[in-house]
């Protein structure tokens, strides 16, 4: 028991920081009820006021994604000038300032209907920049831990994000407004505290050794992002990649399994799970009339969340083993949000082609299932992509703790 508890030492501040940031992103621009201040308890009028002032065809999630992708691409190109990010005051200030400004814009929008469109668009752009930088700052902190702790802290933070989101969505307008302002403040303070407690020898270095990018891994993740994007706007309630019920279910299973069975934890099995879940999810799409949309939606959302989690774990491991700044790897992964955005346009294009709904579902199912299955089999046959040992066995505790 003491050994298990020791695994969690040193991660409380990171978990709080990332959990608050994920909840904030979901409550502002990335969640299903984003921008509706106060939620069901008291914010319906506020959310309606914002919606009435914004053209029905405009989605601030798009402008959030746009800013998020652009700032990620910029960091991919210029990361050598700024790393380590946590030593760069300008980066930390821009991240915190943009997140706080976005919160203020969301809070003010219902009270200033004539300016709500500008506030929400500007706020979404600021949120994308701030959150994109925050994730890279947080990645530098997390990369200082052992692989097993990275697994536990990352899943624990995502769990916390869902819990915070759940409670905030039930608040009244004033409480929710205060929460939206407080969350980025807390996230930034906790992250600063987490970085300050990292020993100097384990902090990210300024130099960048020669390295090659794991392009095949990024291609695989891009395919999953594209596949998820095609169904992202049609998922049932509670399914989604951000702080949702499907995320809670997945992260609870991962955290508890790693915590209570760390010595027998088989990551190789996890590597093979996303393709099974994704294909099953898309095969259930045509059968929604019989099984309901929930089964398909949850399988698709859990699959994409699991793949995203595993890709991050692989990138952290590659960064630690090769001494490469995690910022560049995570920035590329974040920029691949572009594939989800593009995938989201496919259903509309198929509808414009005049195909019946059943035919559209069938076409999407066949194409995505074949692509995902072929790509996964091909790419994960490459031994350099991960930590799966050549004998095929699970990673041992020694593998996890190797510094």
Segments from the language model and where they lie:
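Central cavity-lining transmembrane alpha-helices of secondary-active solute carriers
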Residues: 59-82, 249-258
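Membrane-proximal linker segments that couple transmembrane helices to downstream signaling/catalytic modules
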Residues: 375-403
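Helix-loop boundary and gating motifs at the non-cytosolic
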Residues: 1-72, 216, 220-240
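A late C-terminal transmembrane helix in Major Facilitator Superfamily
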Residues: 324-352
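Flexible interhelical linker loops that connect adjacent transmembrane helices
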Residues: 191-220
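Hydrophobic core of transmembrane alpha-helices in multi-pass small-molecule transporters
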Residues: 116-136, 292-309
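Intracellular juxtamembrane helix-capping segments at the cytosolic ends
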Residues: 131-145, 307-322
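C-terminal ends and interior cores of transmembrane alpha-helices
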Residues: 96-113, 276-290
